[in-house]
Structure formats: C-alpha cells, structure tokens
Amino acid sequence: MTVEFRPVKINDIDAIVEEYERTWGIAHAVGEDASRNLSRRFVLHYLEPSTFGTVATINGKFMGLLLARVYGDKVLFKQVQNMLEEQEAKMSSKGDSLHAKALDSAIGMGQIERKLEAMSHINDLTQAELELFIVSPDARGHGVGGGLWKRTMQHLRHRGVNRYFLHTDTACDVSFYDYHGLRRDATWAKKDHEKYANRVKDLVEDLYIYSGEPFVNRTKRFD
C-alpha cells in the first residue's frame, strides 16, 4: 500500500473527527452523542489556530494528520473560529448533564495547559506549536507517523523555527517524542492535584509540555 501525503483541507474535518473519536473518545463516560460532539469540538479547537497541516491517506482513506501553528503566520481556515464557537454553543444548548460534563472537562484541560505554558514560559522560548498529531492504528507499519513528522519538521525549518513545543498526556505515546529528541519541559501530575483532577479525569491523568528543535534528525523509520 502506498501512503500519500497532502495539505489538509476543510472537508477533511469529518474524517479527522471520526479518527479522533476512535482514538480518544470518552463515550464510556458521557455517552456516544456527547463524546462525538466533544471530539468535533477538540478537532476544531486544534484546527482553528493552525497555519500548516498535512494529511496522510492510503487508497484515499484518511490515515493520519499533523497540524502546526507557526507564530505570526496566516491561519489555514478563518471560518473554523466560527465553527468552533457554534460547536461549543451547540453543546451548551443541549441542556443535558453529559454534554455539560464533556465540555467542562475540555475547558478544564485547556486551563491546565495554559498554566503549564505560563510555568514553563514556553511561548517565549519557541516559535511554533504542534497542535494535533494523530495516526490511525490501521496505518501502523506504513511510515505514516514518520512521514507526517518529517514533512512538518521541513516546514518549520523553512519558516525559520528554531524550537517548537506541544502538549501531550498519558493517553498518548510519548516514546515517539523521546525518540525524536524532544525534552519534557513541564508536568501536571494528577496525584498532586487530586481535587482539580476529578474535573478532567475522563480525558487525561498527567499532562506534559514537550519541546524540540526541527533540526534534530532520526533516520530510522518510526510508525
């Protein structure tokens, strides 16, 4: 099977949401409807500030995505800001406890991420952020993750980025970032914030900020 890489398109959103739900959905905690709406909210949240994005496909089927934001560059899709606001309003207007719980968890997670950014001063030390990195389990072994990473690092170098950062957590495979030479700059551990952790327990446990240089190279394929 041949992997093809191309720029992300606005009409990729549904496929991205489907894979996001498959990977990180919380239907077990809030039900299928609220979980899918939350996945759409997260995808729009990450897409809204993005200035660069690459999609991987196999035989036309979505297999992965990496979104990045270079500070000061033009966003990919201006209309996503309104789409995000509408999605959050839709979830709020549902009037049921499951949608309210899902949205509150996302807002709480965002607040933790902002605290980590402030603690680490990461926005002052970097020129870009990786917004969303997702690879379908169906694509493992085909070089999708490595291909998305390589193309994004090339773009960051082209845009003059010396250092970038990303948010990640215990629901993700952080060994990929260790392999590619990133360092952990900040940690929010559930055990140290038991009271607040209950707010985000359905989404994450521990959260991290990692940062790296787009010049660090790894030749071995990592899927």
Q: Where in the sequence are the language-model features?
A:
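Conserved active-site alpha-helix within GNAT-family acetyltransferase domains
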Residues: 116, 146, 158, 170-193
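Conserved GNAT acetyl-CoA-binding A-motif
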Residues: 127-128, 156-169
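Conserved acyl-donor/pantetheine-binding loop and adjacent beta-alpha core of acyl/acetyltransferases
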Residues: 72-128, 191-202
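Conserved acetyl-CoA-binding loop-helix of GNAT-fold acetyltransferases
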Residues: 135, 141-154, 179
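Conserved GNAT-fold acetyl-CoA-binding loop/helix
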Residues: 21-42, 81-88, 102
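Active-site rim helix/loop that mediates acceptor-substrate recognition in acyltransferases
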Residues: 31-53, 57-59, 63, 67, ...
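Conserved beta-strand-loop-alpha-helix junction that forms the acyl-donor binding cleft
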Residues: 131-133, 137-140, 165-175, 189-195
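A short beta-loop-alpha structural element at the N-terminal edge
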Residues: 4-18, 70
